């Protein structure tokens, strides 16, 4: 597996995770924070983009979903820190490291 392939796959995973998180965060803003119901339109677009991006990944769907989970966790932790402005705990960091280690094992098996 080339470094370029890994970088492209990682970028695709990150874009997919952002599309999913935004697609779920916008309805949260409407339901929990009292923002406009119109947020459901970009949420639906974001979730449709998420589903489309999943089809672009370079392995069988089950393997993609499993490996994608690691990037999703990492992206969610970054979101927690940047968007929610919540400090990260050692448990957040250690748990994320374990998840990413598992993801690395899965991706290594794609060879």
UniProtKB/Swiss-Prot annotation:
Q: Which UniProt keywords apply?
A: Cell inner membrane, Cell membrane, Membrane, Transmembrane, Transmembrane helix
Q: What InterPro entries would the database entry show?
A: UPF0060 (IPR003844)
Q: Could you tell me the membrane topology recorded for this protein?
A: Multi-pass membrane protein
Please list every transmembrane segment annotated in the UniProt record, as residue ranges: 10-30, 36-56, 64-84, 90-110
Q: Membrane: is it a keyword of this entry?
A: yes
Instruction: Read off the Pfam families from this record.
Output: UPF0060
Q: Name one GO cellular component term.
A: plasma membrane
Q: What does the UniProt entry say about where the protein is found? A: Cell inner membrane
Principal subcellular localisation of the protein: membrane
From what superkingdom does this record's organism come?
Bacteria
Matching HAMAP family: UPF0060
Family from the record: Belongs to the UPF0060 family.
The name on file for this protein is: UPF0060 membrane protein IL1642
